[in-house]
Amino acid sequence: MVWRVPPFLLPILFLASHVGAAVDLTLLANLRLTDPQRFFLTCVSGEAGAGRGSDAWGPPLLLEKDDRIVRTPPGPPLRLARNGSHQVTLRGFSKPSDLVGVFSCVGGAGARRTRVIYVHNSPGAHLLPDKVTHTVNKGDTAVLSARVHKEKQTDVIWKSNGSYFYTLDWHEAQDGRFLLQLPNVQPPSSGIYSATYLEASPLGSAFFRLIVRGCGAGRWGPGCTKECPGCLHGGVCHDHDGECVCPPGFTGTRCEQACREGRFGQSCQEQCPGISGCRGLTFCLPDPYGCSCGSGWRGSQCQEACAPGHFGADCRLQCQCQNGGTCDRFSGCVCPSGWHGVHCEKSDRIPQILNMASELEFNLETMPRINCAAAGNPFPVRGSIELRKPDGTVLLSTKAIVEPEKTTAEFEVPRLVLADSGFWECRVSTSGGQDSRRFKVNVKVPPVPLAAPRLLTKQSRQLVVSPLVSFSGDGPISTVRLHYRPQDSTMDWSTIVVDPSENVTLMNLRPKTGYSVRVQLSRPGEGGEGAWGPPTLMTTDCPEPLLQPWLEGWHVEGTDRLRVSWSLPLVPGPLVGDGFLLRLWDGTRGQERRENVSSPQARTALLTGLTPGTHYQLDVQLYHCTLLGPASPPAHVLLPPSGPPAPRHLHAQALSDSEIQLTWKHPEALPGPISKYVVEVQVAGGAGDPLWIDVDRPEETSTIIRGLNASTRYLFRMRASIQGLGDWSNTVEESTLGNGLQAEGPVQESRAAEEGLDQQLILAVVGSVSATCLTILAALLTLVCIRRSCLHRRRTFTYQSGSGEETILQFSSGTLTLTRRPKLQPEPLSYPVLEWEDITFEDLIGEGNFGQVIRAMIKKDGLKMNAAIKMLKEYASENDHRDFAGELEVLCKLGHHPNIINLLGACKNRGYLYIAIEYAPYGNLLDFLRKSRVLETDPAFAREHGTASTLSSRQLLRFASDAANGMQYLSEKQFIHRDLAARNVLVGENLASKIADFGLSRGEEVYVKKTMGRLPVRWMAIESLNYSVYTTKSDVWSFGVLLWEIVSLGGTPYCGMTCAELYEKLPQGYRMEQPRNCDDEVYELMRQCWRDRPYERPPFAQIALQLGRMLEARKAYVNMSLFENFTYAGIDATAEEA
């Protein structure tokens, strides 16, 4: 039974497969290989530059399986392999069900982007199509026939593009076939159709592809008003451009020429693989052709040779040879001598156009010569050959060359315009008949630069220029011609011709001179040179200073002042230089100070404001403009330490014959806490050394000096100490009592009394001196114990581990030993050891309150490499040491991954720990994103190129994908980051993003924060804000915010909202709005990360997989174009602190 579908039920879904003119693109399925694991699909492009990416003026070939309509059980991912520049192969099928479905290959660029579609049916299906591809004209009736292969006594369901279409009773089968008749089909009826037994597996369906041309039979064009050229050998007229899409094995404007056996492609340039030729291969071409066997083969597996008298694709053509011609199943009739034509029906007496190219290309406004050769009997002469333009204009030949076997007419074409693009025709007419050949003429516009060339680097006598810029007109660019000459000069331009892929170095220029530079681009062919582009001014640099100074000497003029002097070698001529640059490097702090001496005649300088007690490395360089000359050999200078100001209002008061009390006031403007006071005691007028006494209680403002001699005048002064001794106070005098000196008045005493007093005085002095010695000895022992305790504390750090146990970390050569107090057994963690001598500190990268990061060159395993060295400052607290040691533990346990900042090694020196990690040359991701906001940094560039960022959509998506891979690794290691944000993601080599800052990471599944501290509120999940609970799902929430930061080019999350508002609105369902430049799919991923219930948020493995698929899709998921009213997301630096 045949079911006729009413017009109002025609399907509206179809697969778009072609835009623009036909592209030389072929998709081959090797049906000889029945084993799924050996089966493969190959897509071949005959286009120039196909498959080589944007560098070849077009995107790469894409071959994939389309699961939107025919869905099969998921399996391992298929493998895509590229063979050369124009071929891609899809492999990796594991079971027969993997083969069933729709496959597509996409090639071409711009308006010529083309999709070729192949539908694969299971050989063991219940129903099989009599013919898979059906190409019909608009308004025709299409009949789809499904042959019963394995009978089931159930109804048959027809579907269109995966949706229900119609049901047939199983009794309605005719001759073992179920038919679907579609009358008056229209282009929207195109698509994938299937016939399936009710309740049977979809894999047992018969799949069809219906292609409906946009015009009626023999017509093409927007209004279907143009007549098709009459395609031969089964070719199909394209309804958009009127070209013939030739079946595999034929070529030519009208598919009139047969390829050699085993050849295919628009120019017969491709060869079927293997010794079997095209046997067992299905060829799929751009619509409206569809798919078929190769020429000379037929059958569902394309392995049956044509029956006698048949030839061509699917053996659909009949030879019907006349005049003794024989039928060849690949090319058709092979005519005997004296006859030609499709059926050998034409005598050789009829004239024939010879060897006419099917396509010619010329440049705009050129006057080319076109040759047309013909043969026949009678012989063609000059007047019998003419040339017709697309507008019907007839051109007569200006010259004819007569040879024994042919006549070649030469036509001089008037100056070409764009309207001359199209199909031209060469026609020959003699008394024996006439012949014509159509060929396509493409008129190309020479390229013209839209912008001036870019200056890459400059020196005093050369400029390095990037000449290839955006241009209008047609490519490809064959040569670049660059003109340059001094500014405001009337001399001739100097010219350099280079390859378009190379930068240009302009040599032997004058220093500090402006040069006008412009570019001319050329494409292949006569007249391919475009107009000159806009000029730009490029200025050479000043001449480099070549003299190397040397340091003559230096002397310290104070604790923070240094006088430096230097000299230069004597050379003839004027001095090339504008001044001197003095550099002081503080290796302890990792800081460099630069002092500019602006006079080239200066040979001395006073450096002030230096840090007392600091060891500096000093050198001097001559500079000219912005160029530095060679540095002098370095010198090493140690400044003396400085102490606090002198104590104030020192006063002395005698208490007895052996004691004097000193009182004072603390110094003002102290740079830090006083560690002690030092008192100097000296007998007035005495010649011996003074005695220094330490006052170890710095909070006191008085002390008693004991053990003095009676009736003796003493001099006193004192100073404070803060990491160094300070200035002395004023000197005061005071005498001890005795020998008639009393506190309240003179007392008269006898001689005997005086002798007794002398004996008492001697005993008092001896006792006082003995007590003083014992006190000093006890103090020394105390200092030794304190020093040992400090050294031990410097080498041992205690921190709270993830398990809640207090952990002691002790560092030895190459191991980090963790002793958990509840346990008796230590747990050593090994780390790579770096020797202190193998670390060369360079520039300061960053600095915090208690730590700093310095770029350094390290030597590891015999190789030198850049590294970032993390260290704590001297006054860091025990908590800082705990977190720092905890970060080393995390790095040791994490191991290596390309998307995290990895540990290179650790080193201990003088009891301090130094951690070496990978160096990220591009800094943190947040700053990198904000620097890309080119509309703010270079508005002219942004508007000229129509872009809001120097980063592409693909690169932004790559940042997110790398971060997701890194977080997947952390989550698999059961680590919680707790502070995931763009500021804590670093950009390394090749712009790969790496998760960093593991100071807050925890190696456990759930962590509950119990201490106070600043919180990254804008990145925190709801459960973390409300209950201080952190899990991997909390990191997933933060990743959603990170993804928003990437899309917004470093915007501040929830900009304009306070933290209090976030606490209130987030539990109520409020989320950040979708950025205007963000695709729906990316924003949906953000929303999934911000779900209220943590268990509903996707795992990092799923996030990484989704972002990876987005990267493979090559779709602009983040729009960086300058659309109307474009604005960047807001930035609030104060809000980011919370």
Curated annotation (Swiss-Prot):
Disulfide bonds join 228-237, 231-244, 246-255, 315-327, 321-333, 335-344. One of its GO terms (cellular component) is receptor complex. The modification Phosphotyrosine is found at residue 1007. One of its GO terms (molecular function) is transmembrane receptor protein tyrosine kinase activity. Phosphorylated on tyrosine residues in response to ANGPT1, most likely by TEK/TIE2. Keywords: Angiogenesis, ATP-binding, Cell membrane, Disulfide bond, EGF-like domain, Glycoprotein, Immunoglobulin domain, Kinase, Membrane, Nucleotide-binding, Phosphoprotein, Receptor, Repeat, Signal, Transferase, Transmembrane, Transmembrane helix, Tyrosine-protein kinase. Residues 22-759 are extracellular. It is linked to Lymphatic malformation 11: A form of primary lymphedema, a disease characterized by swelling of body parts due to developmental anomalies and functional defects of the lymphatic system. Patients with lymphedema may suffer from recurrent local infections. LMPHM11 is an autosomal dominant form characterized by onset of lower extremity edema in the second or third decade of life. Some affected individuals may have subclinical lymphatic malformations. This is Tyrosine-protein kinase receptor Tie-1. It comes from Homo sapiens (Human). The gene is TIE1.
